[in-house]
């Protein structure tokens, strides 16, 4: 097994209808430093996932392929099967399995596949986390930029800005501030130029 995986406990769900095979497989996975949760059927898989938060799922039940609904399971899933014909392989992929192994399988190959799928899953999570961080950073930079531009407004311009956000017209602002409507229009023009906006609607959502 990969050195990094050996350092940690990998949590695995095993769907195995036959009790003695489940025991043998769980013993094998235990030797590989895996924590194995065994279920005899697919029915309660969602509950098991929510309870144990596993890293990967292995299903040894090729007799009931059509019963598996995998579209809502965002975990790597491996099928152990005796079905090796082309049509069977196509069906396996269409159902959403990430990988499959023909029985009897090579234990080392199975561990290699598990290791590879787990790393892919983690890399995807890391990429999603990075994208989320970048998105948040862009929002912060945008807010800082808008805040900096707002700071450059004069006292009078900030007053007009606030009144526009409150929904007042130019005429209403001129009455409140005791200045001409023409003066208000000049302030509005300056605000548009400094904040690089084009209309009053953009002022209403400026800090959002």
Swiss-Prot record:
Task: Report if keyword Transcription regulation is assigned.
Answer: yes
- A Pfam family cross-referenced in the UniProt record is GerE
Give GO MF terms, alphabetically: DNA binding
Q: Which domain of life does the UniProt lineage start with? A: Eukaryota
Q: At which residues is 4-aspartylphosphate found?
A: 60
Does the keyword field hold DNA-binding?
A: yes
Task: Name the keywords, alphabetized.
Answer: Chloroplast, DNA-binding, Phosphoprotein, Plastid, Transcription, Transcription regulation, Two-component regulatory system
Q: According to its UniProt record, where is this protein located? A: Plastid, Chloroplast
GO CC, any one term? chloroplast
The regions listed as transmembrane in this protein's record are none
Q: Which residues form the Response regulatory domain?
A: 11-118
Residue ranges occupied by any HTH luxR-type domain in the UniProt entry? 146-208
What the entry lists under PROSITE patterns is as follows: HTH_LUXR_2, RESPONSE_REGULATORY
Q: Which GO terms describe its biological process?
A: phosphorelay signal transduction system; regulation of DNA-templated transcription
Output the PANTHER family linked to this UniProt entry: HTH-TYPE TRANSCRIPTIONAL REGULATOR YHJB-RELATED (PTHR45566:SF1)
Which protein is depicted? Probable transcriptional regulator ycf29
Gene name of this polypeptide: ycf29
